[in-house]
Amino acid sequence: MAATTAAVVAEEDTELRDLLVQTLENSGVLNRIKAELRAAVFLALEEQEKVENKTPLVNESLKKFLNTKDGRLVASLVAEFLQFFNLDFTLAVFHPETSTIQGLEGRENLARDLGIIEAEGTVGGPLLLEVIRRCQQKEKGPTSVEGALDLSDGHPPSKSPEGKTSVNSTPSKIPRYKGQGKKKTSGQKSGDKKTSSETSQSEPSVSLSESKSKSSLHSLVHETRIASFLSNSTVDAKDKSALCPDEDDVEGDSFFDDPIPKPEKTYGWRSEPRKQVGGLASLSDKPHLRSGLSSLAGAPSLTDAESKRGSTVLKDLKLVGEKIGSLGLGSGEDEDYVDDFNSASHRSEKSELSIGEEIEEDLSMGVEDVNTSDKLDDLTQDLTVSQLSDVADYLEDVA
């Protein structure tokens, strides 16, 4: 019975549905609903195609920059900075706007690419801070290196006359002497103020050339002083050898039996009568002393003491000559033997004279030579003093 009732209800529902559909179709409501539904479906499909084909909002300049290696490195540094300080909300906006949700490098890869070692103390901060520090050190590096080069050079920068330092000027190797370039007249200072910048650049080279010329002049003066000192010493040696008689001629004379003492080695040496007798031959062979008498024509006269001394010497020599004559040494053979010690001119002039007269003449000449040698000592006394030391070059004993 229940089944029959259910079947009856189902049949009634289908009949009601069919009746409703037929009624709606007849009134046009069902067709209008079907058309609206069909239009809504087509509109939904068209809108879906537009959404799929719609281009997203992209920053073209940022996209080009991120395509380069440096741009990706900068974006990675900024992302690492935000991650280091846990700025998650900023990262949520940063990644979509930059379209860098994937592809950015981590901290380790960034440190390796930048050459930063974590052991250097950079763990306490982001990598961006270490990059800025290194850039600042590189900026300060060239100036400190230039300062180190200036200090290692050892020479301070040369100053121009206007007081400006010239860095490009090379240090001079020429020894600088004290007092150079320190004194300047007021006219030079006023002229320096009026000079242009070009002349101020050329002044260091001019000062170098002036220092070179001054040092060369100083060396030339030094050389001339040494040359004059050497020439004076050689002339003094020659005068000593010319004015002092030869010792070998006196000592090697075998005519006299008695040994003859050596004369004193001074310009104004005096000998005893016996020494004069033994040195007649050597004195007669010295023509340069006789020829020098003419140059002393204008010399002042001898003093009375010297004339008295010469007269006493003449008297002693006359006595010696008389003794020699009394001994019988006036023969022709002895006369010829004495002539062998005289020059040819003396032999021709005195061939007919006796030995006593020859001795007197020679002794008179010897006394005059001695007196003239004393005068030469007075006139030609060397008073030069060495310019290289405080000690006299040489000293002479005047009788």
Swiss-Prot record:
GO terms for cellular component: cell projection; centriole; centrosome; nucleus; perinuclear region of cytoplasm. The modification Phosphoserine is found at S152, S160, S202, S301, S326, S331. Residues 70-102 form the LisH domain. Residues 139-217, 239-309, 328-357 are annotated as: Disordered. Residues 245-256 have a biased composition (Acidic residues). The modification Phosphothreonine is found at T143, T170, T234. It is found in: Cytoplasm, Cytoskeleton, Microtubule organizing center, Centrosome; Cytoplasm, Cytoskeleton, Microtubule organizing center, Centrosome, Centriole; Cytoplasm, Cytoskeleton, Cilium basal body. InterPro entries: FOP_dimerisation-dom_N (IPR018993), LisH (IPR006594). Residues 163-172 have a biased composition (Polar residues). Residues 197-217, 290-302 have a biased composition (Low complexity). One of its GO terms (biological process) is positive regulation of cell population proliferation. Belongs to the CEP43 family. Required for anchoring microtubules to the centrosomes. Required for ciliation. This is Centrosomal protein 43. The gene is Cep43.
